[in-house]
């Protein structure tokens, strides 16, 4: 039987929040585009974007202390926090546009107001948090942040965290009422649900992309297999985006572009303790982030989180890190081995040598007992009882390993976009802050991969309609910032 051939304008690989965001933006900018979307699983957002596979934190740098490191001279670095906070405001604006236009329904199903808190104890950590608060206060985006080292005040903000806590402990916290909990799984599936109604958009579930090659005519040829039937297809398109979570690295290697040489991946798995006692769940209404242990990766910063999942309030603590050679929860144990190539073996070995503390930390996490996990939980919930909590597996994250200027390997704890020199291919690697900043990442990608189109009046006007702050800094334009926050709070039904 002849292999089916499909001609398209855009191919999106992976049905997660990134592909949904890019597909939606491109279709709004040019409704005539033909888009083919391929997903290995039988449902969208079942890997990294699923509600149980991530913390659901609307990352805005309100509470995540790893975004504001203390420098050697004692000052607080704020650049990353500012960038992430601006980016999350961009996400809120696009979601507001989609709700206002009726393209997304019931925003309360995917985003809820949940205060973001940072909590620390010990003299040095309290002093750090005070300095962090003062450093962020100079920026309008963080003006509504509150700081307190008063036990009674912190009890108001997070009673469960303070219950049975040693009153002699030196403790401090910050709180931002503007914080949110986001169900990226629901959001992603709703975005794809809308995309599927548009002419020219086709979604293919249970389809594995096993080949990717640049043709002489400048187009890409993707080889795709229907996992359910075994049927194979060839897809031809001038632009391909790979947003396949942990699976992106292997596809980048198949694409064989010069810009992708030297990249490697380090898989880190995660687990949560989920509370099963409704009385305990009701006592907590915040996302409380602490400080990471020495050697711990940034995504392992401990936090006790109120979640809203499928209309129900939930309470999670973690994440506990682990190690698996899989790049996806539904991946293969051979993923790590298959990812090793001549071009990346030196960076991967170099990154391993440089990250001995991380290796030690992961080993300790993997071998810890249920009592060890309870001990970690009790630092944030002193009154916790083992019988009220069950262990759940979270998502799989592949941290980026890339070459530094000397050709040695460095481990990057962030999101990395790799693009071909001609803009015909873009690949998203890495993890946090990921989903929260998806809109800004995709706008930047569009600017790089569609440079001529993005300069046109039509695209410029549409981008400003979807994202009113497009081309401006909300931190610098304080009036616009307040206006946009007021509108997004109203349309997204956020109670601040």
Curated annotation (Swiss-Prot):
Quote the catalytic activity from the record: (S)-malate + a quinone = a quinol + oxaloacetate
Q: In which pathway does it act?
A: Carbohydrate metabolism; tricarboxylic acid cycle; oxaloacetate from (S)-malate (quinone route): step 1/1
- Spell out the molecular function terms from Gene Ontology: 2-hydroxyglutarate dehydrogenase activity; L-malate dehydrogenase (quinone) activity
Cofactors (names): FAD
Disulphide-bridged cysteine pairs:
none
User: Which SUPFAM superfamilies does this entry report, sorted A to Z?
Assistant: FAD/NAD(P)-binding domain
Q: EC number(s) in its UniProt entry? A: 1.1.5.4
InterPro entries documented for this protein: FAD/NAD-bd_sf (IPR036188), MQO (IPR006231)
Q: Name one GO biological process term.
A: tricarboxylic acid cycle
Respond yes or no to whether keyword 4Fe-4S is given for this record.
no
Keywords of this protein's UniProt record, alphabetized? Answer: FAD, Flavoprotein, Oxidoreductase, Tricarboxylic acid cycle
Q: Which family does it belong to?
A: Belongs to the MQO family.
Q: What is the name of the protein in this document?
A: Probable malate:quinone oxidoreductase
State the organism of origin: Flavobacterium psychrophilum (strain ATCC 49511 / DSM 21280 / CIP 103535 / JIP02/86)
